[in-house]
Amino acid sequence: LRLKMASPAQVHIARGNHEDFDMASRYGFLDEVRGKYGENANLTKLMRAYDLLPVVVYLGTGKDFLQVNHGGMEPGYDPRALLAAPGNARFQLLGELKQKTYAQAKPGWLGEDPGAREWAAEHLADFIPETPSTPRMIGFMWNDFTIFPDVPQLGYWRSLVFGPVPTRRILADASTEQIRVRGVIRAHQHSAQLGPLMSRLVANGGVYRHWQTHEDSSHGGQSVEEIRKSSRKPENPQPIPDGSVWTLNVSPDSVYGTGCGFDFAAAAVLSLAPEFKDWRISTLTVNVKFGR
């Protein structure tokens, strides 16, 4: 928020699942605010600021865009009217999220796995959000992605977990002949333990592309060092494949940094160009020293 106040036209913040009163009250964020600003801190004002944050940002050049958000895919939202609207900056209220309508209208969007279709039937609905998690979770803020391409294309762990098949179908359905949504950059799904995703975030300097062609679920138990040894060091900057999903790491000064033992902060630098094939993403890593 301090960065946004200092440069409002250049800093854009997307709302994540923690920017919510329920999460803030349960996980100590309200206590942190009171500790910094006193017992009479205006919590209502802070919550209202959360309400004004967009849950997704489409960043692009006019014909090519990336979906930038905290969580994952939201099949109930159709961005085509927003992307086709005039002007460099435009906004749209989410309105009703038509997840069930989308699933029923798109046969085959989950591939051939009957288990994935069962998850969709159980968890997808048409609804108007009242909060980020009621009556259902907003996918842009909560949903996740699989790490490997050979696991079920839809699952549920805390929220829906999307594989490459439905992810790329949703991106294609969000596109038109004139405008393409090419991929996703996000920063969710972190853990205080070195599981498959956190190990890859640490091994790759804080920016990781899902569904690597040289990996499958048999590599899920690899350590950080094993990942570094078995993987060719990515280019920096890297090209952005169509339909790719990129996860950014979390701050080291957190339970995640303590639990996973990393001491660097990371950012992704996105370089746009007139043609999407020339877009690049760079990893910026800064070592951080602090007392634990």
Locate the predicted segments by residue.
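Extended recognition/assembly regions associated with phosphoester-bond processing machinery
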Residues: L1-R292
